[in-house]
């Protein structure tokens, strides 16, 4: 039903996502309602489809953002720390920050310096206080390595498909924490995986099939056709 969720405004888009049962969390709904996708996607921001933002990067479709926030809702709580790998436009980073509140921190890590600059510009349009308070921190770096300086994280979101689950990211997951990551399987298909750390052990669960751009090095992304 996600493909029927497009709207003419941000509010209509998010209402359609909920009406089509793409997500159930009231907190995720409130977060997405409060962050206008139009600030982050230059073309057709309220269409339920991925949008190109330059530098061979995309902002994921709204239904995937809704699903990710839904799966992470019990870990994106007041005061929590979260990591958004491949933060791109900054959209989901801000949504996550809305859910962890004033005392929480969300680190967005992005390896394209132009997108780091773009995301901060996007955030300052209507959510500059998130940057000023330190609720949102945008870092230039290789997201596959996470950001150990602020670890451990209660929630980790990865916005591109990895060939396997990076150990650096599971190492930075807090006890009781959860990571949502698209993973490319040996047959080339991709699955959205829920990774939980319970009693120091990693538990993995496939929740749905997905299509994402690959999680690569900066050089590979530059050269991708």
Curated annotation (Swiss-Prot):
Location, primary (coarse class): cytoplasm
InterPro entries: PCMT, SAM-dependent_MTases_sf
Catalytic activity: [protein]-L-isoaspartate + S-adenosyl-L-methionine = [protein]-L-isoaspartate alpha-methyl ester + S-adenosyl-L-homocysteine
GO biological process: methylation; multicellular organismal response to stress; protein modification process; regulation of autophagy; response to starvation
Its EC number(s): 2.1.1.77
Subcellular location: Cytoplasm, Cytosol
An annotated GO cellular component: axon
Domain of life: Eukaryota
Residues holding S-adenosyl-L-homocysteine: 57-60, 65, 89, 110-111, 142-143, 216, 221
Family named by the database record: Belongs to the methyltransferase superfamily. L-isoaspartyl/D-aspartyl protein methyltransferase family.
Subunit structure: Monomer.
NCBIfam families, per the entry: pimt (TIGR00080)
Protein name as catalogued: Protein-L-isoaspartate O-methyltransferase
Native organism: Caenorhabditis elegans
